[in-house]
């Protein structure tokens, strides 16, 4: 069945809560192993039902934020989902206290019960109303940014549509596009400040109710981080400052020379090449057809996966009016299919969706029937390793998408990935400050972000733009609003993906087998153990970053300079 044909009927929330509660009562009283496992399966099936319906609503709301029906349904889910979170917490408590715990761990591994313990630390009935308020504020941010209507040269653009123009070869066009974009954010700064301030205060309130001084450790536990914490993140950021920031500055200097602008302003940065950034050849239909060819050639598994995505209509790719910004992959657990959402806008980012989000989706497809499904509840640094690594495994096929621009794509892909890491670290360090200082004013937050930004991104010249000079850039980063402390995961995953890129150049079969193994391990092992199991070095370890950088710079140096202008 195709996605558009999936029938949505509002669930009987009260009935499902009652049904699961009754099953949980039975689980806690299980007399033997068989009864315990049988009831556990029934409980899982009930949770999957509500997850499936929620994801259908969420996807359809993302596709059209102006659809009042799905907007209303999503608000209903936001109100009721904390009740199901409480039931999931109860399931975890029962597992931890059950006399069949060792049987469960023997059959399904210990990681689920380790996460149950994290959940014990982060849940209390007293925070339910606060979680509802948090969800409503997150939805308010999505609605505000998703509904942005920005005038540019007589036309109305959304955020994604305007970002595409910021890569234009004409400098005045880039400047005007950025001024329009930042003008919208500046005009909405007070609303964005209020939403974020309310979120920080609610999250701090939640942390205090749970017995924590700040929200930071709560966020780490909620992210399922079993074997690394904020002290690991701090040491990791120090490695970025020492090794990656200097390399990124050299890449920016090379860019300035290449595009002939000695003192680049912020609106020059998206233009990597004077001849124009690499653009994919073709519209959505052609790009998807090329992606199918690519995945069939890459492996039997990837070919089967992508064909199913097309046949079942599990992608909504091109930007349009009312569509939420960004891109993501999510899963429909009963349909047993992943779904890819994005905003194609005619840039190389369109191809990145067909590799990055497809990497997420491929892993979801490989593990679509995993039981218990909690063994597929990925930590984000592992999830993003799946997606970012797929970007590199598909490198040999980029000529299909870019033709003569493929050499530029290869360069820009690696260079942009290196340049991204300091930005990701800046967002993480900013959040450390925000949640350590929840009473800071919006003005103080912006000043702190600008201070951090100068440390990790010293090349930035905002050309006197008041909104940016005062530290407003972070408000465009939705993760700060929606998923506290998530963003550093992208950088950790990037280091893992770089390792796969280097390994793939040396031995494709070894690299691909390791990647498939990592996908199938899913969430059955904590991060450091999973990486060790598949032969990757931990990004937190001293020397991991330093070791791979020479191979990346060597690769960049090997590309044809005549084609990179």
Where are these regions (language model features)?
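Catalytic Zn2+-binding segment of zinc metalloproteases
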Residues: 359-373, 393
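Hydrophobic alpha-helical scaffolding
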Residues: 127, 131, 185, 189-193, ...
């Amino acid at each position: 069945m195709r996605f558009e044909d999936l029938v949505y009927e509002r669930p009987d929330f009260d009935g499902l809560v009652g049904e699961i509660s009754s099953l949980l009562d039975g689980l806690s009283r299980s007399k033997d192993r068989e009864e315990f496992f049988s009831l556990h399966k029934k409980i899982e099936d009930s949770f999957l039902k509500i997850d499936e319906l929620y994801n259908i609503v969420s996807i359809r709301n993302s596709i059209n934020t102006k659809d009042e029906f799905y907007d209303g349904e999503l608000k209903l889910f936001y109100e009721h989902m904390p009740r199901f979170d409480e039931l999931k917490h109860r399931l975890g408590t029962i597992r931890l206290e059950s006399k069949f715990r060792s049987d469960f761990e023997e059959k399904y591994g210990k990681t689920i019960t380790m996460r149950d313990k994290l959940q014990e630390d982060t849940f209390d009935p007293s925070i339910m109303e606060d979680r509802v308020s948090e969800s409503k504020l997150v939805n308010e941010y999505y609605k505000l940014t998703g509904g942005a209507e920005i005038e540019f040269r007589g036309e109305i653009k959304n955020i994604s549509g305007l970002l595409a123009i910021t890569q234009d070869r004409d400098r005045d066009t880039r400047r005007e596009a950025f001024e329009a974009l930042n003008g919208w954010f500046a005009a909405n700064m007070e609303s964005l400040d209020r939403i974020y301030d309310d979120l920080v205060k609610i999250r701090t309130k939640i942390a205090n109710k749970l017995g924590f001084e700040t929200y930071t450790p709560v966020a780490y536990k909620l992210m399922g981080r079993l074997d690394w914490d904020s002290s690991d993140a701090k040491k990791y950021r120090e490695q970025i400052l020492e090794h990656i920031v200097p390399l990124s500055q050299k890449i920016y200097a090379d860019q300035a020379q290449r595009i002939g602008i000695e003192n680049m302003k912020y609106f020059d940065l998206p233009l990597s090449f004077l001849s124009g950034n690499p653009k994919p050849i073709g519209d959505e239909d052609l790009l998807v057809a090329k992606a199918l060819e690519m995945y069939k050639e890459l492996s039997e598994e990837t070919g089967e996966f992508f064909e199913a995505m097309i046949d079942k209509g599990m992608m909504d790719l091109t930007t349009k009016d009312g569509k939420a910004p960004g891109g993501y992959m999510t899963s429909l657990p009963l349909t047993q299919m992943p779904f890819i959402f994005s905003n194609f806008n005619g840039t190389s980012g369109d191809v990145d969706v067909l590799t990055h989000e497809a990497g997420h989706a491929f892993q979801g497809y490989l593990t679509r029937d995993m039981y218990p499904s909690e063994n597929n509840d990925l930590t984000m640094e592992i999830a993003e390793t799946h997606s970012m690594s797929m970007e590199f495994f598909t490198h040999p096929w980029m000529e299909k998408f870019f033709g003569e621009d493929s050499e530029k794509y290869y360069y820009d892909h690696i260079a942009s990935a290196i340049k991204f890491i300091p930005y990701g670290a800046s967002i993480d360090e900013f959040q450390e400050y925000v949640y350590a200082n929840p009473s800071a004013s919006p003005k103080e937050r912006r000043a702190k972000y600008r201070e951090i930004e100068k440390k990790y991104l010293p090349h930035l010249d905002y050309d006197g733009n008041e909104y940016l000079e005062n530290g407003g850039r972070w408000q465009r980063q939705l993760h700060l609003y929606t998923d506290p402390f998530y963003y550093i995961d992208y950088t950790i995953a990037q280091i893992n993906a770089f390792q796969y890129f280097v390994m793939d150049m040396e031995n494709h079969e070894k690299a691909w087998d390791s990647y498939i193994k990592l996908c199938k391990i899913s969430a059955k092992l904590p991060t450091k153990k999973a990486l060790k199991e598949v032969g990757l070095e931990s990004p937190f370890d001293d020397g991991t970053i330093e070791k791979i950088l020479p191979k990346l710079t060597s690769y960049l140096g090997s590309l044809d300079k005549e084609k990179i202008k």
